[in-house]
Design a protein with these regions (language model features):
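Short, T/G/N/S-enriched strand-turn elements that build extracellular solenoid repeat scaffolds
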Residues: 2, 70-73
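Extended terminal
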Residues: 35-63, 74-76, 106, 112-118, ...
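Short beta-strand/loop motifs in extracellular/secreted proteins, especially
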Residues: 10, 130, 180
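Outer-membrane beta-barrel pore domains and translocons
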Residues: 15, 61-63, 88, 126-128, ...
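Extended amphipathic alpha-helical repeats with heptad periodicity, i.e.
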Residues: 1-3, 60
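Beta-propeller and related beta-repeat scaffolds in trafficking/envelope systems
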Residues: 13-51, 72-116, 132-162, 185-226, ...
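Repeat-solenoid scaffold signature
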Residues: 156-174
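Membrane-embedded beta-strand positions of outer-membrane beta-barrel proteins
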Residues: 12-14, 85, 123, 182-184, ...
Length: 315
């Protein structure tokens, strides 16, 4: 190997077997939310030296993730690097120390990365029965989500699997500030069994489970606080929320919600734990609807029946 300042020529082969990363040091250096687990690895790399460029092909295999690189070109003159990559994570939950949340499933992604004055990275993956294509420029992340299954996403993040739908979304997020926004289009949404839909079916004869909803979901993200709105519509019904407050750290929700089934409108409030929020119905509005009047008729009949029983006992 010749090693002149700008006239490198040769080949370097690197082999590491049964290596162990210094998890304690890395956790402190990168200020991970929780300690990085013990990570063992094997590394095989081959670097071709030509001029002022070192071109590396590498395979990194560990108990957390595997990374394959076909060509990582490092330019000695300006310290820039340009590389492809393929990332495989068999268990996303092992990345809790980075993601700060539990996630089910696995991940395979590929893309390119370059670092000179700026950092640029592309990311492509099949996730939750759909596709995600993202671009990172320094701290700015832009992502396009295509045909992702809502039910699969809810399952991944340990949220209640209340509905399934096809989602398309655009995400704009600043990693340094932990702030951003999301705009999503929902198609063919269907809901699982719940008490609210059961009551609507009982008093309005509208089967909300047979309805297929389409519409929009938007959200503004500020660290763990999310401010969202939902507007879903079907042939016979609609579901709307505005200023929905979610906290991903405490797992809490606080929102007003309006459900309409034909001419019947039910307004209420969801508050508490996302997994099992309390539901408070606006009875005044509900009683003015056709369904409310039917409930009132049934209640009156029950009261009348009980009064008649009482009078029969008295006389």
């Amino acid at each position: 190997m010749d090693a002149g300042a700008n006239s490198l020529s040769g080949k370097v082969e690197t082999r590491v077997t049964k290596g162990v990363l210094d998890s304690k040091y890395l956790s402190k250096m990168y200020e991970f939310a929780s300690p990085m687990p013990k990570t063992s690895f094997n590394l095989k790399a081959e670097t071709l030296l030509k001029g002022d460029i070192a071109d590396t092909k590498a395979e990194f295999n560990s108990n957390i993730a595997d990374i394959d690189i076909k060509s990582a070109k490092f330019t000695l003159k300006d310290g820039s690097i340009k590389s492809d990559y393929k990332l495989s994570v068999p268990d996303l939950d092992t990345l809790f120390f980075v993601t700060k949340r539990h996630i089910r499933g696995s991940l395979v992604a590929d893309g390119d990365i370059s670092k000179a004055k700026d950092l640029d990275l592309t990311f492509n993956s099949n996730i939750a029965k759909g596709k995600v294509a993202a671009k990172l420029h320094n701290d700015e992340l832009l992502a396009d989500v295509s045909s992702v299954s809502a039910n699969a996403v809810l399952h991944m993040f340990f949220y209640p699997e209340i509905a399934d739908a096809s989602l398309n979304a655009k995400i704009d997020y600043n990693l340094a500030q932990s702030r951003g926004s999301m705009k999503a289009q929902v198609a063919d949404a269907v809901f699982v069994k719940n008490q609210t839909f059961d009551l609507i079916k009982q008093y309005t004869k509208v089967d909300m489970y047979r309805e297929h909803f389409n519409g929009d979901v938007s959200a503004k993200i500020d660290k763990e606080s999310v401010l969202a709105s939902v507007d879903l519509r079907s042939k016979e019904a609609s579901i709307k929320t505005a200023a929905t407050k979610l906290n991903t750290k405490t797992n809490k929700i606080d929102t007003d919600i309006t459900l309409r089934a034909k001419k019947n409108e039910i307004s209420g409030r969801l508050v508490g734990d996302i997994d099992s929020p309390k539901i408070v119905i606006d009875l005044e509005k509900f009683m003015k609807s056709e369904a409310g009047k039917k409930v009132e008729e049934k209640v009156n009949k029950v009261i009348e029946k009980e009064i008649n029983k009482l009078f029969k006992k008295l006389f």
